[in-house]
């Protein structure tokens, strides 16, 4: 149960357009005032709740509007939070090895990701700039520099948005407009037969330069996740089957995955065979036990009447149950 400190969440009309649905700020009624875990954000429409710090330090999540120091509530769009949760499903925590690790070390070359609570346990170093509204985490192996002027020229410049750009000490690069003009000219000069190859590689490079490559791959993975859900629900269409078949077997991109999947099949086969052997051993043990019980009955060690009755009560208990007192018999007669 939490105390509500914001109006109900939902799309808000602003001059004919809809602003993004935002998370509601709640305060845990059982936490002490001011505790870092007491502030929770909740989205009733999506049934999602998250701690404030888990949201603030998530590498791929930013607020959907400028933070107002006079308003303690944060502006987290529900759509962005759902996207970050989905992104975290593919990230394993460097400490607990479980999914959902959206808090990454802010050094671009470091691959460590945490849950916020695991980052604290691992003594990760937080870096907060209230004026800029940035919340960063550095793993213990990569403590942050005290001043930007002390960083090396080839060190990365990191932003809260999760888009990391390395500074280059090499020759100056061409402006983007010039690059794009050259790209269009090359497109016109390429023969038709090589046009597809000329388009695809530069297209992905342009996505990278525009900071949209991650967005593109996230949409691809989201599409795959949606198809996977339909397969699990047994609602997949014929086009879903054809699409996955083409992706896996026709394009050759996932040949290594199929080879690894063969190893998974072998491993599962061995696992189930081992289970089957264990079940056979248990069945044999039960059969031996039944045979021993039968031999005890033949030798008179067990009362046949007791074994056929299907009850574990001693014989005297059966007699007590069967012999009713005169009062009980009289009562039963009266009831009739």
From Swiss-Prot:
Keyword Transcription: yes
Subcellular location: Nucleus
Keywords: Activator, Metal-binding, Nucleus, Transcription, Transcription regulation, Zinc, Zinc-finger
Record region (Disordered): 1-20, 139-179, 303-336
Comp. bias intervals (Low complexity): 303-314
InterPro entries: EPHD (IPR034732), PHD-type_Zinc_Finger (IPR051188), Znf_FYVE_PHD (IPR011011), Znf_PHD (IPR001965), Znf_RING/FYVE/PHD (IPR013083)
GO function terms (MF aspect): zinc ion binding
Zinc finger (PHD-type): 91-143
First and last residues of each zinc finger (C2HC pre-PHD-type): 25-61
GO cellular component: nucleus
SMART domains: PHD (SM00249)
SUPFAM superfamilies in the record: FYVE/PHD zinc finger
Job of this protein: Positive regulator of Th1-type cytokine gene expression.
Subunit record text: Interacts with BRCA1 and RELA.
Protein name: PHD finger protein 11
Upper classification of the organism: Eukaryota, Metazoa, Chordata, Craniata, Vertebrata
């Amino acid at each position: 149960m939490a105390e509500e400190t914001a109006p109900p969440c939902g799309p808000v009309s602003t001059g004919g357009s809809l602003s993004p649905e935002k998370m509601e700020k709640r305060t845990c009624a059982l936490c002490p005032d001011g505790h870092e875990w007491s502030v929770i954000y909740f989205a009733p429409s999506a049934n999602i709740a998250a701690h404030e710090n888990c949201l603030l330090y998530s590498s791929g999540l930013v607020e959907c509007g400028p933070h107002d120091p006079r308003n303690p509530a944060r502006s987290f769009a529900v759509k962005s939070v759902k996207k970050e949760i989905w992104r975290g499903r593919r990230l394993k925590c460097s400490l607990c090895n479980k999914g959902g690790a959206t808090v990454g070390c802010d050094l671009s070359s470091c691959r460590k990701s945490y849950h916020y609570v695991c980052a604290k346990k691992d003594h990760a170093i937080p870096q907060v700039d209230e004026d800029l509204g940035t919340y960063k985490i550095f793993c213990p192996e990569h403590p942050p520099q005290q001043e930007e002027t002390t960083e090396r020229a080839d060190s990365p410049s990191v932003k809260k948005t999760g888009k990391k750009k390395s500074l280059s000490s090499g020759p100056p690069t061409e402006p983007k407009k010039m690059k794009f003009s050259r790209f269009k000219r090359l497109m016109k000069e390429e023969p038709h037969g090589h046009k597809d190859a000329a388009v695809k590689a530069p297209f992905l490079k342009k996505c990278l330069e525009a900071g949209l490559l991650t967005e593109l791959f996230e949409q691809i993975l989201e599409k795959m996740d949606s198809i996977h859900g339909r397969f699990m629900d047994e609602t997949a269409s014929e086009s879903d089957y054809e699409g996955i078949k083409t992706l896996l077997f026709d394009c050759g991109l996932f040949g290594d995955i199929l080879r690894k999947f063969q190893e998974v099949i072998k491993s599962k086969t061995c696992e189930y065979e081992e289970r089957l052997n264990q079940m056979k051993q248990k069945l044999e043990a039960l059969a031996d036990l039944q045979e021993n019980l039968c031999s005890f009955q033949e030798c008179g060690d067990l009362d046949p009447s007791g074994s056929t009755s299907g009850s574990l009560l001693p014989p005297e208990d059966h007699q007590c149950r069967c012999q009713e007192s005169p009062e009980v018999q009289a009562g039963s007669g009266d009831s009739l």
